[in-house]
Amino acid sequence: MATIKQAFKKRIWECSEKYKPTYQISYMENKDIMETEFTVNAASTAQNELQDFWNDFCKDNGLKKNSVVAVVCVG
């Protein structure tokens, strides 16, 4: 498991989309792998935007920030 920043450093993601890409975040919650999606403004700003979205998502859902399993660009 990792944070969004760690996932980007490890390149636990794939992306061919360049305009407003959508990323699927897989994460651990109560021993289950769950998924959510976020759309960012550009691939070049994806890491920072995803980090902000993820922080808010974790706060709203009572999750640990380092529960990320994978980050995949899905469109």
Language-model features, listed with the residues they occupy:
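Hydrophobic beta-strand residues in large extracellular and virion-surface proteins
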Residues: 23-27, 38-40, 50, 68-71
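Short N-terminal "domain-start" leader segments
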Residues: 1-22
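Short, flexible beta-strand-to-coil junctions
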Residues: 26-32, 74-75
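A short, charged, amphipathic alpha-helix used as a generic interaction element across diverse proteins
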Residues: 43-65
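A short, exposed loop/beta-hairpin motif centered on an aromatic-Gly-Thr core
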Residues: 32-46
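Short stretches within intrinsically disordered, low-complexity N-terminal or propeptide regions
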Residues: 4, 9, 44-48, 72
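Short glycine-rich, low-complexity/disordered patches
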Residues: 22, 57-75
